[in-house]
Amino acid sequence: MSTIAITGVSGYIAQRLVQRLEADSDIERIVGIDVAEPKFRFQKLDFYRLDIRDPHIAQVFSGTDAVVHLAFVLNPMQDEQLMRDINVEGTRNVLNAVEKSGSRKLVYTSSMVAYGARPDNDYPLTEESPLRANTDFSYAEHKLEVELLLQKWKADHPDVTVTIFRFAIVFGRHVQNFISRTLESPRIFAVRGYRPPLQFLHEEDAAESLYFALTHDLDGAYNVCPDDEISFEEILEIAGKKTIELPQSVMFSLAKLGWNAGLLEAPPGEINYLMYPAIMSNRKIVEAGFQFKHSSRDALADALDANRGWVTIGRWRMPENVYRSRVNAVKSVGLAITGGYLLRRLAKRRASKRL
């Protein structure tokens, strides 16, 4: 009988994993920590409201057989030092807790962003491809920093199985973050001359892959992505969106202004991933025995369907009917101002003719 600890246990993927573990007779107990209460409760789950930076998690993890580290700030924060403190120093604290607990397995979810978005990326990216995350994108920088931290920790703890899953962009009905909200914009901003394909990992496959990691010995890094990729044009077609194309220099300048002013959800470094492809190969994990049930198109379709009827502009998200009413109100005000201006011009012209 095993005891599994999970950080970030209140997230949807973690909850799906807990549900899977709940049904496994070999799992006796699940220890979950998060700063937010989980939406669902499970018989085997012992929940602790803790930040991953809290030193008390070492006591909570005592006696666990495996730790799944999912807690990580995805949506970029204006306070980048705080974001790094949670993501990197929080992970360092988790590793300390794993060491003290006697756990023999650690599963960590990294991301395709750790490879970076570069014009000379391998196609496809394999686990042997260099990690060159764009350091002007805090989320990517932290994923890379944590991977390097894990590599060093693994060297000092060779008896612990350390699994690093590099997820593709996770999409599905329950995903709600700055990436998914990009597709809720009335128009999709694009860099002129660039149309990179993308991969989307379905949330259900993401959860199932974590269960697979717990029930198999997978030491090292694994790309976790479906077989297919989607072209930029097909994404626009499926989403029913049109683009606003801007030159690269203009796009980065506007993104920097918007981010510094607190109007945008992500820093300018995100734009690199809208320019250069970061397409991964899943050969290694498939050869290990994992089977994907969903394609990139499935993940995209589910995300779009779940969020249909919503519009996001910068940091503001609203129902589509509210957006349209505000647009119509602005149009009405604009027409009224324009009409008033024209009437005044006409009145002045008539007055001058009388003179």
Give the location of each predicted region:
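NAD(P)-dependent short-chain dehydrogenase/reductase
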Residues: 153-203
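Active-site Tyr-X1-5-Lys
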Residues: 135-163
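Amphipathic terminal alpha-helices
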Residues: 296-355
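NAD(P)H-binding glycine-rich loop region in Rossmannoid oxidoreductase-like domains
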Residues: 39, 45, 49-89, 97, ...
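N-terminal Rossmann NAD(P)H-binding glycine-rich loop of SDR-like oxidoreductase domains
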Residues: 4-23
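Conserved Rossmann-fold NAD(P)-dependent oxidoreductase catalytic core, especially the SDR/UDP-sugar
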Residues: 93-138
